[in-house]
Amino acid sequence: LLKLDNKINIIYRNYKEKNDKVEIENIVKFCKKNKRKIFISNHLKIALNHDFNGLYIPAFNKNLNFKNISLKKKFKIIGSAHNLKEIRIKEKQGCEEIFISPLFKIIKKKGFLNISRFNYLCSLTKKNIVALGGINEKNFNQLHSVNSSGFASISWIKKNRPIIK
């Protein structure tokens, strides 16, 4: 993580095990020390109690109880979606930024959006959109054609640890 540009934010996702309080505190402390924003997936109470920068709401979470909660000043809610119906849910959940995926072909999923469908979905919302899914060194230059405020990659960043200037 130290090699990554500090503009790269971290989303802590732990769907399999019970959350370890010490591990969470260490991750938050590490990110704050290195001036990196840290979000936690699906756990609003933990996010607020442990000074996370925000909450990430995955596409499968359709709960609408997030919007009317009083949050600290710079706390940010972000989410992910795969289609227009999920984008509308993320808007109702109060997400400031929405990750739309998959932009390019990925192994885990049968279909993908492609640039024109992705841009069409982006045009249907006023929220900041982040491109996600299948982004790698072969298609990285195609991101110039995408109407998004940024991009996210899991496997490419893990594999290459790019330092973005």
Model-assigned labels for residue ranges:
Residues 1, 38-57, 82-94, 123-130, ...:
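Catalytic cores of alpha/beta
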Residues 1-6, 30, 69-72, 91-92, ...:
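Acidic (Asp/Glu)-rich catalytic clusters
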Residues 23-40, 67-83, 111-134:
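Alpha-helix-loop-beta-strand connector modules within alpha/beta enzyme cores
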Residues 55-68, 99-111, 134-165:
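Glycine-rich phosphate-binding active-site loops on the catalytic face of alpha/beta enzymes
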